[in-house]
Amino acid sequence: MPYINNFLVGPIGLGLKSLTWTENPVPDEEAFRIMNYALSHGCSFWDAGEFYGLSEPLANLQLLSRYFQKFPDSIDKVFLSVKGAFDPETHRVHGTRECITKSIKTVRETLKKVKTIDLYQCAAIDPDTPIEETMACLKEFVDSGDIRCIGLCEPSVEEIKRAHSVVRIAAIEVHYSMLFREIEYNGVKKLCHDLSIPLVAHSPLAHGLLTGRVTTMADIENLKKHHQCNEQPPSSTFSSTLPCIQALKELASKYDMSLAELALSFILSAGRGRILPIPSATSYDLIEASLGSFSKVLDTYQFAEVVSCLEKTLPPPASPNSEPQVTGGCSSMC
């Protein structure tokens, strides 16, 4: 299990986005049930966003504020990661001192200063602000105690190196799943391993494609309708990966796993304790199903069989920068 800023987080984290980034946010009673279940089963890394709401951008943080006020014993048990510095109106990330200062102030005030921001990261890399300036600004907030450590979201290899030269990077969030293995080709996974930086894998279930719940084009369109963001899988992605998904379902059945359990177990095996998947859930049943992968880790042979399946049924990135660096498989929880 990875340590982030000397905090031992469970092998699987919890993404909170889907609780509020929807036309019909999950009611508090159900949301709190999901959060408490996850925490009681070792999911201590929680991923939140300053802008994770449709009608109310601060809905995600407001949910957390209500949760921690109702369950104060959970405050010190949760490692809270927050994305910020994103303008939901322009869909732009701003890594300037002015915007970061405003963002961190907003997050702390919305949380009512009940819970410290354990890890803060801009929601993406701002192409218009030198990353060295952004990191230097964030370091000042670490020094002042407003945030405890700094992360990066979807950086390139060069951006990681530049940021790392300014300040210690505690974690890096990337898009990673069985269907999206870009970090194995572009050097990010290898560099983070070399620098001992844990990776946090968002969308480990490929926006529903690896849960078995998304089976038709209509399901894709329904996701787009109710979750208004550009991260939902396009129809072209679904059609091109359908043969792969069917093959993975067969492997999951062979291993006595659900497709979601296979998807998360693959990441745990590929990361060997250095990649933390953060699935999200909109119901108690879904989070319960996801956490079944705690006890179902792929052995070396099974992991190799999954990799072979992926290589046969799923094309690699169009222009990979390197050969895939896929290692993994273990007989016990890492």
UniProtKB/Swiss-Prot annotation:
Active-site residues from the entry: 52
Source domain of life: Eukaryota
Region (Disordered): 314-334
Enzyme class (EC, first level): oxidoreductase
Keywords: Cytoplasm, Nucleus, Oxidoreductase
An annotated GO cellular component: cytoplasm
Enzyme Commission number: 1.-.-.-
Claim: Nucleotide-binding is one of the keywords in the record: no
Single GO MF annotation: aldo-keto reductase (NADPH) activity
Compartments where found: Cytoplasm; Nucleus
Keyword field contains Chaperone: no
Composition-biased stretches (Polar residues): 320-334
Pfam families membership: Aldo_ket_red
UniProt similarity note: Belongs to the aldo/keto reductase family.
Protein name: Uncharacterized oxidoreductase C3A11.11c
Organism: Schizosaccharomyces pombe (strain 972 / ATCC 24843) (Fission yeast)
